[in-house]
Amino acid sequence: MNLEAYFPVLLFIIIGVGLGLALMTIGRILGPNNPDPDKLSPYECGFEAFEDARMKFDVRYYLIAILFILFDLETAFLFPWGVALRDIGWPGFFAMGVFLLEFLVGFVYIWKKGALDWE
């Protein structure tokens, strides 16, 4: 097995990691270090922090985030399918139809369960 072809990749990784570490070290050494209470306090839209950071968080935000990720992934699958539709033909068309139908059924289900109601 000829490993000489991988030498440029190894060199690229070594230079990238070395340059990154060198720049972080130079920034740490030469950068100003003047900690004070204002700089060390958490920033909350220009106001003082109201409550502890470990307060309870409404689960609906998580639900909306998960739904966003699911439909974002659906969109990510739709683009390459649209580009390759001419090559994959009717079997690919029907496979994507089943995929979209599953998402539609899931969307109707969460809609009927009230997951999208913000009351």
From Swiss-Prot:
Residues that span the membrane, as ranges: 7-27, 63-83, 88-108
Cell division among keywords: no
Any single Pfam family the record assigns to this protein: Oxidored_q4
Signal peptide range: none
One annotated GO molecular function: quinone binding
One GO cellular component, as annotated: NADH dehydrogenase complex
Catalytic activity reported: a quinone + NADH + 5 H(+)(in) = a quinol + NAD(+) + 4 H(+)(out)
Function: NDH-1 shuttles electrons from NADH, via FMN and iron-sulfur (Fe-S) centers, to quinones in the respiratory chain. The immediate electron acceptor for the enzyme in this species is believed to be ubiquinone. Couples the redox reaction to proton translocation (for every two electrons transferred, four hydrogen ions are translocated across the cytoplasmic membrane), and thus conserves the redox energy in a proton gradient.
Quaternary assembly: NDH-1 is composed of 14 different subunits. Subunits NuoA, H, J, K, L, M, N constitute the membrane sector of the complex.
PANTHER family noted in UniProt: NADH-UBIQUINONE OXIDOREDUCTASE CHAIN 3
Family, similarity comment: Belongs to the complex I subunit 3 family.
Protein name (record): NADH-quinone oxidoreductase subunit A
Protein species of origin: Ralstonia nicotianae (strain ATCC BAA-1114 / GMI1000) (Ralstonia solanacearum)
Originating gene: nuoA
